């Protein structure tokens, strides 16, 4: 009888835990909902949330706008969601709202882009400095002789992109490369502007050895990006094209000859892990403060594997 009673208690406890998890709502906040990169984080979030029995709410600014991101985060705090994962557009701007969430006993983590000076409890995403280094290493592999380069970033206050720039500079400047005047340019995650800036770099510096962004924004304006590459390769067939990320449009660009190498992140993995980490935090469990998602190097030799 005692064993039966204990078994019944255990079953009730398990059912109670499952019911509690089913009621939990976790917010995933991207820098901008117009960025296809974050669609994969959303998909990973939704799939994992269904698997573990929680709800993933995906909402962010329509486009890259740090002030709007802060307001959306504030709204989630007011609504009393059970946890928040945010890809931080401006590391300084979120410090206050993250503290408010923590004061309200709402777990907060960052994904993709960190704010390590805030009260966030964990980060899940790329080692961005290493990604910058890898971009540089791939360029040097294609063009061993030191030359000149221009680079492009998204928002100047994005910690992840600044880390990526630092890694790129470490790799290239350490190997004797020189950055051209006007670099880096900042596109604020705007694909059309990003493609135009690449063209502008080439127009102003027709002898530049390479133009190597730290984000793949330009490839999401395919026609404009293809026009840029076609213009360059009419005169410079040997210009190496090393691009970040490996979303389907970028993989197809590589397959079609509009890139030589892609250094890809794993945004779906970030979205999924964000749900797992928030659930653990909500249950009072310990989590690792830094959770690194890996990188993938894609070339013409293995692109078909990634396109499947």
Locate each region found by the language model.
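A residue-level marker of the well-folded mature domains of exported/periplasmic proteins
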Residues: 3-5, 13, 20-308
